[in-house]
Amino acid sequence: MNKILVAYDGGDPARRALETAAELAKLTGASVAVVSVVPTHPGRFPVDPSDDTSVHAQELLEARRMLREKGIEAELIEPTGDPAPTIERIADEGGYDTVVIGSRGLNAMGRILQGSVSEHVATHSKATVVVAR
């Protein structure tokens, strides 16, 4: 394990993913990057992605602070797009061998209606995917 990508959105599942990534990095000496995707919202009305940028920037800074408290430096990545395929693309193009992502614990209906980012990444990424619960 050389490169860990952790998906982070500030929620409790993402915090658990960050903790898991920190533990793995300490055990293996792997480098860590944190990605927080600014989602684009398809629909009838255009949404300005810059509206979400400051929120995601704050989430990334929070993640960096949490990792620094554990003695880990991290690269911060803030792309825009659909979160699931964007995380998958960054992991694959960046050569990350491990992706750590939180699980929201959606029930079957929630997965059908909303989709599951962790399920998509685990199914499609070339990297090993660790789902923190």
Where are these regions (language model features)?
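Small/aliphatic-rich secondary-structure junction motif
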Residues: 2-50, 70-72
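Aromatic/hydrophobic pocket-lining residues that form π-stacking "cages" and hydrophobic walls in ligand
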Residues: 17, 21, 63, 87, ...
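Class I S-adenosyl-L-methionine
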Residues: 61-68
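Conserved beta-strand positions in the Rossmann-like core of class I SAM-dependent methyltransferases
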Residues: 33, 75, 130
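Short, surface-exposed alpha-helical segments at coil->helix boundaries
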Residues: 50-61
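Structural beta-alpha unit
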Residues: 68-99
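Generic structural signal for helix capping and beta-alpha/helix-loop junctions
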Residues: 41-42, 84, 108
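Gly/Ser-rich helix-loop-strand patches that form or flank binding pockets
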Residues: 89-133
